[in-house]
Swiss-Prot record:
GO CC, one annotated term: voltage-gated potassium channel complex
Binding partners and assembly: Interacts with KCNQ1; impairs KCNQ1 localization in lipid rafts and only conducts current upon strong and continued depolarization.
Pathological association: AMME complex: An X-linked contiguous gene deletion syndrome characterized by glomerulonephritis, sensorineural hearing loss, intellectual disability, midface hypoplasia and elliptocytosis.
Tissue specificity as recorded in UniProt: Highly expressed in heart, skeletal muscle, brain, spinal cord and placenta.
Glycan attachment points: N2, N25
Any one biological process term the GO annotation gives: regulation of heart rate by cardiac conduction
Record protein name field: Potassium voltage-gated channel subfamily E regulatory beta subunit 5
Gene coding for it: KCNE5
Effect noted on mutating L65F: Found in patients with atrial fibrillation; uncertain significance; loss of its inhibitory effects on KCNQ1
Membrane topology: Single-pass type I membrane protein
Length: 142
């Protein structure tokens, strides 16, 4: 093999290495003696400068997407837990929840409340006119 063919072989291998780096298939081939040859940085033998690959440029977007996903997941879990606690507390005090619902304006007991108020006022008038019976002097107090 003469010297000219070895140069062609070296050029062919350099191009192949560059293509593999751009496609992301060369996992360990990029580690060289220079510290600037990390992930996403490929030496370009034809231009003499480093070219960044598309794989390294999109890494921060992927990390950001995962962080947003987990933030939404945590927020949803917190919201679901808060709602479930409110439901449990509402079940513990059914009388208060029922009273708030029934005594709302225009509720079911509005007509009943008006009728009861009328009968209470009538009963007070009768008691006031007749007077209360006097308690016996010797009655025991409870």
């Amino acid at each position: 093999m003469n010297c000219s063919e070895s140069q062609r072989l070296r050029t062919l291998l350099s191009r192949l290495l560059l293509e593999l780096h751009h496609r992301g298939n060369a996992s360990g081939l990029g580690a060289g003696p220079r510290p600037s040859m990390g992930m996403g940085v490929v030496p370009d033998p034809f231009v003499g400068r480093e070219v960044t690959s598309a794989k390294g440029d999109d890494a921060y977007l992927y990390i950001l997407l995962i962080m947003i996903f987990y933030a939404c997941l945590a927020g949803g879990l917190i919201l679901a837990y808060t709602r479930s606690r409110k439901l449990v507390e509402a079940k513990d005090e059914p009388s208060q929840a029922c009273a708030e619902h029934e005594w709302a304006p225009g509720g079911a007991l509005t007509a009943d409340a008006e009728a009861a108020a009328g009968s209470q006022a009538e009963g007070r008038r009768q008691l006031a006119s007749e007077g209360l019976p006097a308690l016996a002097q010797g009655a025991e107090r409870v």
